[in-house]
């Protein structure tokens, strides 16, 4: 089963400095049919104006993955971590028993991100933050694991959930496949381009909620950049 959630039908808010679209209920947007997808709780499509951002605020008991689509995001937190994550790269914050952080666009142009929240397997624990570059060339033609709670994914950023965040770049006409296990929930968004997911068309920034599909086959109709979450 694949349910398409068109970009134009997503919830959202325009705060001037922040233009946000919500694939699931978040802040002032509430849809009882879209409270999450398995352990995937939030997928926000954010556009952050230059020299603005989110001031310090708290989180707890959530795995927060930020995928930078354009520009760069600068992170600061109460543990003393600081870092700048550029387009195509990923940062992960395990909020654990509590952390405060801020995220700023210190760039001269708009920064565009996907922010993804996944519920952890267990509450509590020491909070942490990390970031890693993932060159788009390394993802050409196949899925690469960007963040994972599985020990076998040694090159991915670690998260505290039985979940994966994967990325791929596909030239028009190319295909990539991913095996989705029994009882798993997949959610796929094309950051750019246009794709077919098991024969169902998705335009850029549409979402596809995937369930009871043993294999996810993605064919690019245009040059495309894809993010997929595999969650319990």
List where the protein language model places each region:
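Jelly-roll (double-stranded beta-helix
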Residues: 1-232
């Amino acid at each position: 089963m694949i349910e398409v959630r068109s970009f134009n039908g997503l919830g959202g808010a325009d705060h001037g400095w922040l233009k946000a679209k919500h694939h699931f209920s978040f802040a002032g947007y509430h849809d009882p049919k879209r409270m999450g997808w398995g352990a995937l709780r939030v997928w926000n499509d954010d556009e952050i104006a230059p020299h603005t951002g989110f001031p310090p605020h708290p989180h707890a008991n959530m795995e927060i993955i930020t995928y930078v689509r354009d520009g760069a995001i600068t992170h600061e937190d109460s543990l003393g971590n600081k870092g700048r994550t550029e387009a195509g790269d990923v940062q992960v914050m395990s909020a654990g028993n509590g952390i405060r952080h801020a995220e700023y666009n210190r760039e001269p142009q708009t920064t565009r991100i996907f922010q993804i929240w996944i519920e952890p397997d267990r509450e509590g624990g020491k909070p942490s933050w990390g970031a890693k570059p993932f060159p788009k060339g390394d993802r050409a033609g196949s899925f690469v694991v960007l963040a994972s709670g599985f020990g076998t994914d040694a090159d991915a950023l670690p998260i505290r959930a039985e979940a994966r965040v994967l990325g791929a770049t596909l030239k028009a006409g190319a295909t990539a496949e991913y095996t989705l296990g029994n009882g798993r929930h997949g959610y796929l968004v094309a950051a750019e381009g246009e794709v077919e997911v098991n024969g169902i068309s998705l335009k850029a920034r549409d979402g596809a909620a995937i369930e009871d599909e043993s294999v996810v086959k993605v064919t690019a109709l245009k040059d495309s950049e894809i993010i997929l979450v595999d969650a319990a």
